[in-house]
Each structure stands twice: as structure tokens, then as C-alpha cells.
């Protein structure tokens, strides 16, 4: 019983951390990284398709991404999709290759991005605490139904707290890494 509750809580907490990671990927640093374009969708024969499924995305240098479409007729569509995305990027086409220079971040922009990252991290911590509350509630229900003893409940809550601390620490590590990335010039 307790192990099932712990396993469920741990699964949900790892998903919360993954969600924070994916939110962090959308926050642009000064460095070029293919995951910046993960949210870009291209009109591919009438359906919105992720850019990574219609083109190769490569890092040409520290501040430039290269996009090579698999079909030449997609070049204008990809350009349009990148311009439409709210990433603040301006693609430059050179034949079949689309180069995307990463604009340098101003100090103010860096601080705003870091604020956004802190908010995402806080949302992740809140989600983890809510999962802890749910798990502890499930343990209390088992005590009420006399399926586990008070001592088992206490041990279970301690285990839930350890798991919670582990995942909150993971979010903190990722936030620190993101801050380092953002504040690096």
C-alpha cells in the first residue's frame, strides 16, 4: 500500500521536474541550442508539424543555428514559422539553408528571463508540494480505514518527505544551471 503511494508520488514528481526542464528549454540564453526551436510548428501540407520533423537543426557556432529542410519548398514556410514564433529570432536564408543568428541578450532581458525561470521553478516546487499533500492524504485515508498503523503512516510520511526533498533539490539544481547560462556573457 505505502509503496504504491510512494511510487505514484515519485512518478508524478519526476513529471513535474520534466515539465520545469521543458519550460527552461523555451527560455532563450545567449547561446545557440536546437531545443530553442522545439516550440516552432511549420505548416506542412496543411498540418502544423514540429520543425524538428521537417528539417535538420544544427549548431553552426555559439550564436548561430542552421536549419536544413528536407524539402526545398518548405524554406519559406519554415522562415515564416520562425518569424511568427515569439522567440525574437530573424532567420536569414542562403539557398536551402536557413541561418538563425542568436541576438545578444541585454542585461535587462537576462534578468527578465531569469525571473521567468524562477517562476517556472516555483510552479514546479508547488506542484511537487501538492503531490506530497496528496500522498500524505492517501496515507491518512489508509489509517482511517485501519489498513495501516499510525507508525506506518509516520514512516510513510517521512519517506514521502525524503522523495519531496529529492525532487525539489533537482529543480533547484536546474534553476542554478539556468541562471549560470543566462548570466554568462
Swiss-Prot record:
Q: Name where it mostly resides.
A: cytoplasm
A single Gene Ontology molecular function, please? ribosomal large subunit binding
**Is Zinc-finger set as a keyword in this record?**
no
Keywords assigned by UniProt, alphabetized: Cytoplasm, Protein biosynthesis
**Top-level taxonomic group:** Bacteria
Subcellular location per the Swiss-Prot or TrEMBL entry: Cytoplasm
- Tell me which stretches of the chain form a coiled coil: none
GO cellular component terms attached to this protein's record: cytosol
Is-annotated flag, keyword Protein biosynthesis?
A: yes
The Gene Ontology biological process annotation of the record reads:
cytoplasmic translational termination
Q: Which SUPFAM superfamilies match?
A: Ribosome recycling factor, RRF (SSF55194)
Q: Which family does it belong to?
A: Belongs to the RRF family.
Q: What does this protein do?
A: Responsible for the release of ribosomes from messenger RNA at the termination of protein biosynthesis. May increase the efficiency of translation by recycling ribosomes from one round of translation to another.
**HAMAP family linked:** RRF
For this protein, the record's PANTHER family field holds: MITOCHONDRIAL RIBOSOME RECYCLING FACTOR PSEUDO 1, RIBOSOME RECYCLING FACTOR
Q: What is the name of the protein in this document?
A: Ribosome-recycling factor
At the highest ranks, the source species' classification is: Bacteria, Pseudomonadati, Pseudomonadota, Gammaproteobacteria, Oceanospirillales
Amino acid at each position: 500500500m505505502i509503496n504504491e503511494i510512494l511510487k505514484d508520488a515519485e512518478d508524478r514528481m519526476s513529471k513535474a521536474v520534466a515539465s520545469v526542464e521543458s519550460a527552461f528549454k523555451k527560455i532563450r540564453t545567449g547561446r545557440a541550442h536546437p531545443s530553442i526551436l522545439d516550440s516552432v510548428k511549420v505548416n506542412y501540407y496543411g498540418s502544423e508539424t514540429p520543425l524538428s520533423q521537417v528539417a535538420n537543426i544544427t549548431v553552426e557556432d555559439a550564436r548561430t543555428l542552421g536549419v536544413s529542410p528536407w524539402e526545398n519548398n518548405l524554406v519559406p514556410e519554415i522562415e515564416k514559422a520562425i518569424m511568427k514564433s515569439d522567440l525574437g529570432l530573424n532567420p536569414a536564408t542562403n539557398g536551402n539553408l536557413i541561418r538563425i543568428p542568436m541576438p545578444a541578450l541585454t542585461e535587462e532581458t537576462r534578468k527578465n528571463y531569469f525571473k521567468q525561470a524562477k517562476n517556472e521553478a516555483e510552479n514546479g516546487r508547488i506542484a511537487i508540494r501538492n503531490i506530497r499533500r496528496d500522498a500524505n492524504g492517501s496515507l491518512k485515508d489508509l489509517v482511517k480505514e485501519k489498513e495501516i498503523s499510525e507508525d506506518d503512516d509516520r514512516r510513510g510520511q517521512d519517506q514521502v518527505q525524503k522523495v519531496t526533498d529529492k525532487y525539489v533539490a533537482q529543480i533547484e539544481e536546474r534553476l542554478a544551471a539556468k541562471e549560470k547560462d543566462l548570466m554568462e556573457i
